[in-house]
Curated annotation (Swiss-Prot):
Belongs to the CDC123 family. The keyword Nucleotide-binding applies. This is Translation initiation factor eIF2 assembly protein. It is found in: Cytoplasm. ATP binds at K105, W108, S110, R112, R168, K169, W170, C171, E178, R180, R194, D234, D247, N249. Its main location: cytoplasm. Mg(2+) binds at D247, N249. The keyword Transmembrane does not apply. One of its GO terms (cellular component) is cytoplasm. GO terms for molecular function: ATP binding; magnesium ion binding; protein folding chaperone. Keywords: ATP-binding, Chaperone, Cytoplasm, Magnesium, Metal-binding, Nucleotide-binding.
Length: 335
């Protein structure tokens, strides 16, 4: 895998070409100070919105959760979350233009490993503070920032990356309708059930129809239209049978191979299964009823140090920020 292949899978690189096949999205350049904040281990969240000037009744009635001060014998310091007013306005305008709820991601990754920390246990975001909470809790997002070329074989200097916040219109996608597709030398060699930890009866019953519809979609819209010969793409098959393009990923270890192994994907001649007699038909792997349902691969991400600090009170700054976020959400609901 080469660095150029990783760069080609950035959302803003492929979305303009395949826009009509995918979910409506908005891309916003990520300011350097926002990137620094997301990588900072200090403050957990920010308000994500500008407060109106003047003194309101809520200001007068603010509790210890709203104005927290740390004092010693000689001085007093006020804990204040950082603000990004211009960026916040752009983000909120984009969210509103996409219907009020979005699915956020960076150039490559979404914070799928951090969904559990959100108040709604979902990646559905309506404010910048929702996005910040997920991003600062996600190892996947941190990887985008710090190790995007970790598995690349070329020794050339790492290219300069212009980081972007990607906001996708929120859609209620059924996990059992998502599939990952593996392409080698511009040939679709394998399809895997995306949520392989669960058994879905409809996949078993419709396996041939699913395989053929994805292969047709690939041949009509994707094949020879992506800059690389080897790549991975994700699709969603809706209730009407329409295939939607969700994402592109590099062909290599940085991408989860799901029900395949990377060794067999590289040796594509070794993929054929008993049921697949057509030479040019991709191998389709899915979880069948005989296989024991597996735990979610994201379970290992559910107890980061930030969460332990919150639960034990060892990091007072993060605890106060979390309380502030809850208070802000409650105040907005009452407005």
């Amino acid at each position: 895998m080469k660095k150029e292949q990783v760069l080609n899978c950035q959302f803003s690189q492929w979305y303009p070409r395949f826009k009509k096949l995918s979910i409506r999205s908005v891309v916003i350049p990520l300011p350097e100070n926002v990137k620094d904040y997301l990588l900072d281990d200090g403050t957990l969240v920010v308000s994500g919105r500008e407060e109106s000037p003047g003194c309101s009744q809520r200001d007068l009635n603010s509790t210890a959760e709203d104005e927290v001060q740390w004092s010693d014998d000689e001085n007093t310091a006020t804990l204040k979350a950082p603000e990004f007013p211009e960026f916040s306005i752009k983000v909120q305008e984009a969210i509103n233009s996409l219907g009020g709820s979005v699915f956020p991601k960076l150039n490559w990754s979404s914070p799928r490993d951090a969904y559990w920390i959100a108040l709604n246990s979902s990646l559905k975001c309506q404010t910048l503070s929702d996005i910040f909470l997920l991003f600062k809790s996600s190892d996947f997002v941190t990887h985008d920032f710090t190790q995007p070329f970790i598995y690349c074989a070329d020794d050339s200097p790492d290219p300069n990356i212009k980081y972007e916040l990607v906001l996708r219109k929120w859609c209620e996608l059924i996990p059992g309708a998502e599939f990952r597709c593996f392409v080698k030398e511009n040939n679709l060699i394998g399809i895997s059930q995306r949520d392989y930890t669960q058994y879905y009866d409809h996949i078993s019953k419709q396996k041939e129809e699913i395989r053929k519809s994805i292969q047709y979609f690939f041949q009509e819209h994707i094949q020879y239209n992506f800059p690389d010969e080897d790549f991975v793409f994700d699709v969603y098959k809706d209730s009407q049978g329409k295939i939607w393009l969700i994402d592109f990923n590099p062909f290599g270890e940085v991408t989860d191979s799901l029900l395949f192994t990377w060794d067999e994907l590289r040796r594509s001649w070794n993929l054929s299964d008993v049921e697949n007699e057509e030479q040019d038909c991709p191998t389709f792997r899915y979880t069948n009823s005989e296989v024991t349902v597996q735990p979610s691969p994201f379970l290992s991400y559910r107890l980061p140090k930030d969460f332990v600090d919150l639960s034990t009170g060892e990091d007072a700054h993060k605890l106060i920020d979390f309380l502030k976020l809850n208070r802000n959400e409650q105040d907005e609901d009452s407005d």
